[in-house]
């Protein structure tokens, strides 16, 4: 068995790579590691999923794995990933399990695991779970009354909506938003949350049938949202992915507001309100150089981490900071959650618009992005290729040619057999040329 956990849990093609048998093994192993019985009595686990078709099969397997290890299951049904993380903490569960492949196509699925308090797992805990799943460490297997039971949480969505309401001090009355729910886990709660806050809401791609999740919609396909915002004369559009742990925006003209621009707007607002701890923002190495420049000009320190909101969260926790995120739209507010929360991000972004009376385009203009080119190269062994001397020499040469006018980032994907090549430069043609040359080198190794 190869390593199961990537940068965001276990993920693969459902029923071939991520099978029901593997899901049961992983869940049983997670229960063994995270929910060993103690003086507090029987342990519980929160289980949720996105609406893709394979979710029902994998949910049954995960529930079987958890209960076979003596853990009671609190099934919250179809809800966003951040809702499962929140409910894991709110319901005092020993762990939480979200069944989702996030922005991936419908045939894929995944398993994300949260520890008590709704926190993502660190590498050491993942290693222990993998050891149990592989059979090198004994798993728990109680009998009789020791086997776990299952119950649903009928008010799970309402609990999450009430939690979101506490994060927005002002009304969104007067704002019109188009929200693209990607036919995913936010199809019910995102429009409800925005309406409850006072916004006029036009919901699109909010009719999941198990097969249409992320299909030409959501945060990876903004075309329908951009068109709808202009057609409805909306103030902005918000796009979520399949499990709603991310949020991207478009302005009234349909232009993209990415995660870096969203973080700029939020960081400046929190700075002005005295809520930005140590005037520090946490972002990943993928954030545009323009974000670094904007934060420096605003007197805000930018701390960078590895890619993945779990690493952003680690950076936030280690420094006690109050805002962090990724260019992809994962934004973390530690005061309100332990993982990226797309719906919360949308609320806070609109809250800043309502507070200032400014259009999102004007607020986002505080950051000017450098042209960025990202090329994904499919390879047989992503780590070996990324560490190849030939590739490393090519990166050094590209960096030398850019000098202070850009940067190069080359890294293996955490979820797929890809090497990602990213080049930023003041001239888009220079960035494109260097990115293509590096991608060619990667492909040739």
Curated annotation (Swiss-Prot):
Pfam families in UniProt: PGM_PMM_I, PGM_PMM_II, PGM_PMM_III, PGM_PMM_IV
Annotated organism of origin? Rhodococcus jostii (strain RHA1)
Q: What is this protein called?
A: Phosphoglucosamine mutase
State the UniProt keywords alphabetically: Isomerase, Magnesium, Metal-binding, Phosphoprotein
Positions bearing Phosphoserine: 102
GO-annotated biological processes: carbohydrate metabolic process; peptidoglycan biosynthetic process; UDP-N-acetylglucosamine biosynthetic process
Q: What residues sit in the active site?
A: 102 (phosphoserine intermediate)
Q: Which domain of life is it from?
A: Bacteria
Q: Entry's SUPFAM superfamilies?
A: Phosphoglucomutase, C-terminal domain, Phosphoglucomutase, first 3 domains
What job does the chain carry out? Catalyzes the conversion of glucosamine-6-phosphate to glucosamine-1-phosphate.
The cross-references to PROSITE patterns, in alphabetical order and at most eight, read: PGM_PMM (PS00710)
> Cofactor stoichiometry and binding?
Binds 1 Mg(2+) ion per subunit.
GO MF annotation, one: phosphomannomutase activity
Give residues annotated as binding Mg(2+): 102, 241, 243, 245
EC number in record? 5.4.2.10
Co-factor requirement:
Mg(2+)
